[in-house]
């Protein structure tokens, strides 16, 4: 009664009644108020635009060779200069960004799917499923990551999709633990117990209850993991175990410029791909941190 009287008074005074907002809207508002996250978006947007659209407006292809431009410095003709065989460094930096992002996003999609399924099955599948899933997670997390990465890459071989598989197999255990912790709490709630009582199968529990209640974890994990995957791809390619030449990636461009002569005399051959790598990782981390803070349940209390 009092609320209706208060609402009528607000209407008479010409004031609007504040509309209630859901948790997703509040999370979006917190994200938009995060200056670091917005700064990350400002950094990442032009880089993504250039990486995705450069074939439409750049006259050079990544593997076009101009023998007259070998090791030439940045100029109006070659904005980032040319490498040791006359290839345009700007075109290769943009193509390297496309391949690095393709590898990163693909590996994150794969690792997110694996991590969610194993974590959800562990939480909702019963005692034996939990024991088997968690022992596999423990085994994966006890392996030294660098050694495991190098051994797996040498077994599977180099290539774009091989690199995707290698990074995904290294990245899923942390997510599976987070999903398991979230869904162990969820399975004790009445609506999940009611679904179990009505004979709902594991697939129904996973995708009807588990997935919608894990979206915040998945979004934050995937965003932060993209930056980590870009670094892993660059490291593998730098060591010759990732994307093989002549395909361009930021890692193998840095590998090609590792000689002392190039480092000292032709710094544009490593400075621009290295700068793009740092810029992309920094921007994505800012965005991921902003998403993590926006979805943090403690922010609701503050």
Swiss-Prot record:
What is the stated purpose of this protein? Probably part of an ABC transporter complex that could be involved in peptide import. Probably responsible for the translocation of the substrate across the membrane.
* Chain segments annotated as transmembrane: 38-58, 101-121, 147-167, 200-222, 230-250, 268-288
Could you tell me which residues belong to the region Disordered? 1-22
Residue ranges of domain ABC transmembrane type-1 in the record: 97-288
User: Protein name, please?
Assistant: Putative peptide permease protein BOV_A0350
Q: Where in the cell is it found?
A: Cell inner membrane
Positions in coiled-coil regions: none
Its Gene Ontology biological processes?
Answer: peptide transport; protein transport; transmembrane transport
Organism, scientific name: Brucella ovis (strain ATCC 25840 / 63/290 / NCTC 10512)
**Topology relative to the membrane, per the entry?**
Multi-pass membrane protein
Pfam families, A to Z? BPD_transp_1 (PF00528), OppC_N (PF12911)
Q: How does it assemble?
A: The complex is composed of two ATP-binding proteins (BOV_A0347 and BOV_A0348), two transmembrane proteins (BOV_A0350 and BOV_A0351) and a solute-binding protein (BOV_A0352).
Family affiliation: Belongs to the binding-protein-dependent transport system permease family.
What InterPro entries would the database entry show?
BP-dependent_transpt_permease, MetI-like, MetI-like_sf, OppC_N
What PANTHER family does this protein map onto? D,D-DIPEPTIDE TRANSPORT SYSTEM PERMEASE PROTEIN DDPC-RELATED, OLIGOPEPTIDE TRANSPORT SYSTEM PERMEASE PROTEIN APPC
Query: GO CC terms for this protein?
Result: plasma membrane
The alphabetized UniProt keywords are: Cell inner membrane, Cell membrane, Membrane, Peptide transport, Protein transport, Transmembrane, Transmembrane helix, Transport
């Amino acid at each position: 009664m009092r609320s209706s009287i208060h609402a009528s008074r607000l209407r008479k005074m010409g004031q609007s009644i504040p509309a209630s907002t859901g948790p997703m809207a509040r999370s979006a508002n917190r994200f938009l108020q995060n200056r670091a996250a917005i700064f990350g978006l400002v950094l990442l947007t032009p880089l993504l635009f250039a990486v995705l659209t450069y074939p439409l407006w750049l006259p050079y292809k990544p593997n076009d060779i101009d023998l007259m431009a070998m090791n030439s410095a940045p100029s109006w003709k070659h904005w980032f200069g040319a490498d040791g065989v006359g290839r345009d460094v700007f075109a290769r930096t943009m193509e390297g960004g496309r391949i690095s992002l393709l590898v990163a996003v693909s590996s994150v999609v794969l690792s997110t799917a694996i991590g969610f399924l194993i974590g959800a099955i562990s939480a909702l599948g019963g005692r034996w499923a939990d024991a088997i899933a968690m022992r596999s997670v423990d085994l994966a997390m006890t392996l030294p990551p660098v050694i495991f990465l190098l051994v797996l890459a040498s077994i599977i071989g180099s290539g774009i999709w091989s690199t995707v598989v290698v990074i995904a197999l290294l990245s899923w255990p942390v997510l599976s633990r987070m999903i398991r912790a979230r869904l162990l709490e969820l399975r004790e709630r009445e609506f999940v117990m009611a679904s179990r009582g009505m004979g709902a199968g594991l697939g129904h529990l996973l995708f009807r209850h588990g997935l919608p209640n894990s979206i915040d974890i998945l979004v934050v994990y995937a965003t932060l993991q993209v930056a980590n995957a870009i670094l892993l791809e660059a490291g593998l390619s730098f060591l010759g175990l990732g994307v093989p030449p002549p395909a361009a990636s930021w890692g193998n461009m840095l590998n090609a410029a590792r000689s002392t002569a190039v480092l000292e005399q032709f710094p544009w051959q490593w400075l621009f791909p290295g700068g793009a790598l740092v810029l992309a990782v920094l921007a994505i981390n800012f965005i991921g941190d902003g998403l993590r803070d926006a979805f943090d349940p403690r922010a609701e209390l503050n």
